[in-house]
């Protein structure tokens, strides 16, 4: 991620748009084709070099940016201006990462969960904040878990944040608002967060050492019944 240089538009017409990922236009492209007659929008990925991991900007942040750009009436400069780098500084060693989310922050929490599992950088446990009272709070009493909390500033958020510090080793608070742009920025924060956790554990998110079964399952086409 390179701050305001993360995404740029290099070509634009009524039916076609080409987006560049990072500062190297020759490396990654995401092209959008619009079929107005049939109401179909196609996203086509072009990558110069074969990616070594399923974890990539092309598969996560950029599609979200395309959709966000649509809902912002093609005000892509607003997306660029709002994108920035985020720094973290905490001990990442723990038994599990407890992720506190809700309907408004599902995209970011799903990214965290899948990336932690796929890259092998931590064990994620997803909590719906509104269901946390139903026995799930028992897990936090292990005292060696790290909480990642998506904070919208509600009364429930204030209550949970005041309590979690008593039971968790660390509470990482990611502030957000119930808006599309804010949810996009929350996803960016989570990308920097996973990058930090991976670096502390000396893992490479761009070159995950997958179990051999991964490719077998990825190409599996037989029956499941």
Would you name each region that the model predicts?
Residues 20-22, 31-34, 39-42, 107-109, ...:
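Small-side-chain structural scaffolding
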Residues 1-84, 143-146, 150-176:
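Glycine-rich phosphate-binding loops that contact phosphosugars or nucleotide phosphates
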Residues 107-108, 156, 181-185:
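Secondary-structure boundary/capping motif
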Residues 47-144, 219-225:
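Active-site phosphate/pyrophosphate-binding segments
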Residues 23, 128-129, 176, 210:
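Proline- and acidic/polar-enriched loop/turn elements at helix boundaries
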Residues 141-148, 190, 194:
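Short basic, glycine-rich beta-strand/loop surfaces that mediate nucleic-acid
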Residues 165-225:
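Phosphate-moiety recognition in structured ligand-binding domains
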């Amino acid at each position: 991620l390179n701050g305001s240089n993360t995404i740029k538009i290099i070509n634009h017409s009524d039916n076609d748009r080409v987006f560049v990922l990072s500062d190297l236009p020759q490396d990654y492209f995401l092209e959008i084709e619009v079929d107005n007659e049939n109401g179909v929008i196609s996203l086509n990925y072009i990558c110069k070099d074969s990616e070594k991991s399923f974890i990539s900007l092309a598969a996560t942040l950029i599609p979200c940016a395309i959709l966000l750009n649509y809902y912002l009436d093609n005000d892509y400069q607003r997306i660029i201006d709002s994108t920035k780098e985020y720094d973290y500084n905490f001990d990442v060693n723990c038994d599990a990462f407890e992720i506190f989310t809700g309907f408004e922050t599902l995209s970011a929490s799903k990214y965290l969960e899948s990336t932690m599992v796929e890259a092998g950088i931590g064990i994620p446990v997803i909590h719906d904040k509104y269901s946390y009272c139903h026995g799930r709070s028992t897990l936090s009493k292990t005292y060696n878990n790290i909480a990642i909390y998506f904070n919208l500033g509600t009364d429930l958020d204030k209550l949970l944040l005041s309590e979690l510090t008593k039971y968790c080793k660390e509470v990482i608070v990611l502030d957000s608002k119930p808006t599309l742009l804010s949810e996009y920025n929350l996803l960016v924060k989570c990308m920097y967060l996973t990058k930090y956790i991976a670096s502390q554990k000396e893992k490479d998110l761009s070159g995950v050492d997958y179990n051999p079964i991964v490719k077998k399952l990825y190409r599996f086409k037989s029956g499941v019944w």
